[in-house]
Regions:
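Short, small-residue-biased leader/transition segments that mark boundaries at the very start
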Residues: 2-4
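Short coil/turn connectors at secondary-structure junctions
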Residues: 21-26, 55-59, 89-91, 165-167, ...
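Beta-strand elements within well-structured catalytic alpha/beta cores of enzymes
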Residues: 25-34, 60-62, 115, 168-175, ...
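Active-site histidine-anchored catalytic micro-motif
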Residues: 22-50, 54-81
């Protein structure tokens, strides 16, 4: 695809250079889907490849499953494809949840908080085989959009795979509306109820999420 031949934007270079110089993690957030409405998985792959080309070694993906713009049970294949792709790079799938939680746009903050707590505090169902966990959700009548937060558990330090202050965060959704709430509580302001606190992050988005 031509997407892999494009030169990274200056703002992306600056973020990757910052991460490299300060030994910080880079986190990729977004809808892992080939639906092309809010995001496209090819963009995530390009970002991972580019970060690796910069010599970055601490790359983490926080995946949101679709189920609305594509087949409601296509997430297992999408995630399996992503896992196979990142085997060639210093990247790991850290967490996963349905877009119902991560991409709410109607101020239902209790949903956003479940995604926030997952990627910041590691609160979710533990899994050592996330594709199997997704398929178990299907068996229980839960499709991609509604998959409960999952933290991918392995032998590595859990905290390092979560979003920490001073890290780089790249939200790769390119449509404005459904990335807004999670971006706001991660990087712009504190919310009292339910409690979510903004963090000190180098936060990048694919477009402006503000009105």
């Amino acid at each position: 695809s031509d997407v892999y031949k494009r030169q990274p934007l200056a703002v992306l270079k600056n973020a990757f250079n910052y991460a490299k110089e300060n030994n910080k993690s880079v986190h990729f957030l977004g809808l892992v889907s080939d639906g092309g409405v809010h995001s496209h998985s090819s963009h995530l792959k390009y970002l991972i490849k580019t970060a690796s080309d910069f010599g970055l070694k601490k790359l983490f993906v926080h995946a949101f499953t679709d189920g609305r713009d594509v087949d409601p049970k296509s997430g297992s294949k999408q995630i399996s494809d992503l896992i196979n792709y990142i085997k060639d790079y210093p990247a790991k799938l850290s967490s996963l949840c349905g877009r119902y939680y991560a991409m709410d746009r109607d101020k239902r903050w209790e949903r956003t908080k479940k995604a926030y707590d997952l990627i910041v505090s590691g609160i979710g169902n533990k899994s050592t085989d996330v594709v199997k966990s997704i398929e178990q959700s299907y068996e229980n009548g839960i499709t991609d959009e509604f998959i409960e937060p999952i933290i991918i558990h392995n032998n590595d330090n859990l905290k390092s795979s979560l979003i920490n202050n001073e890290d780089v965060v790249i939200f790769f959704n390119f449509r404005t509306d459904r990335g807004r709430q999670l971006t706001e509580v991660l990087s712009q302001y504190d919310l009292e109820e339910p409690s979510m606190s903004k963090m000190k992050l180098k936060f990048l988005t694919m477009t402006s999420y503000n009105d």
